[in-house]
């Protein structure tokens, strides 16, 4: 047991845990945040990978819907209004982010039916 051997070859490059998991979100940073926060005395190796994957999925879902909202408004740049429309028009995301206020998001367009002008018989002729 001299401590030598079974080490890395000199030419090999280190792979990040994010690239090993096939993620864009930083697994190492999520692990550091989990350790730094008061979530538990120990953090397993799989927990930050799973959490990073969930965060990446939610981000991709919101950006997909916000991109659709931007395209519907003939815009090429996503603004907070598009994020608001995306989240509030999706039932599950609205439930998840129900207590969240998006700055500069505005409100959903909604006019009560009783406030709309009444349709008369003359208008239909």
Curated annotation (Swiss-Prot):
InterPro entries xrefs: Histone-fold, Histone_H2A, Histone_H2A/H2B/H3, Histone_H2A_C, Histone_H2A_CS
Protein name: Late histone H2A.1
Molecular-function annotations in GO: DNA binding; protein heterodimerization activity; structural constituent of chromatin
Domain of life: Eukaryota
The keyword Transcription regulation is assigned to this record: no
N5-methylglutamine modification, residue list: 104
Assembly mode: The nucleosome is a histone octamer containing two molecules each of H2A, H2B, H3 and H4 assembled in one H3-H4 heterotetramer and two H2A-H2B heterodimers. The octamer wraps approximately 147 bp of DNA.
Biased composition (Basic residues): 1-18
Organism whose genome encodes this protein: Psammechinus miliaris
Modification N-acetylserine occurs at: 2
PTM field: Monoubiquitination of Lys-119 gives a specific tag for epigenetic transcriptional repression. Phosphorylation of Ser-2 directly represses transcription.
Localization: Nucleus; Chromosome
Covalent cross-link site, Glycyl lysine isopeptide (Lys-Gly) (interchain with G-Cter in ubiquitin): 119
Record's function text: Core component of nucleosome. Nucleosomes wrap and compact DNA into chromatin, limiting DNA accessibility to the cellular machineries which require DNA as a template. Histones thereby play a central role in transcription regulation, DNA repair, DNA replication and chromosomal stability. DNA accessibility is regulated via a complex set of post-translational modifications of histones, also called histone code, and nucleosome remodeling.
């Amino acid at each position: 047991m001299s401590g030598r051997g079974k080490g890395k070859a000199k030419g090999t490059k280190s792979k990040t845990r994010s690239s090993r998991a096939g993620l864009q979100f930083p697994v190492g940073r999520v692990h550091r945040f989990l350790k730094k926060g008061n979530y538990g005395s120990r953090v397993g190796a799989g927990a930050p990978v799973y959490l990073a994957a969930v965060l990446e999925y939610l981000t991709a879902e919101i950006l997909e819907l916000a991109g659709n909202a931007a395209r519907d408004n003939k815009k090429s740049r996503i603004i907070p209004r598009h994020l608001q429309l995306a989240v509030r028009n999706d039932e599950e995301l609205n439930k998840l982010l129900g207590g969240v206020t998006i700055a500069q998001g505005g409100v959903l367009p909604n006019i009560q039916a009783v406030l709309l002008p009444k349709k008369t018989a003359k208008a239909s002729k």
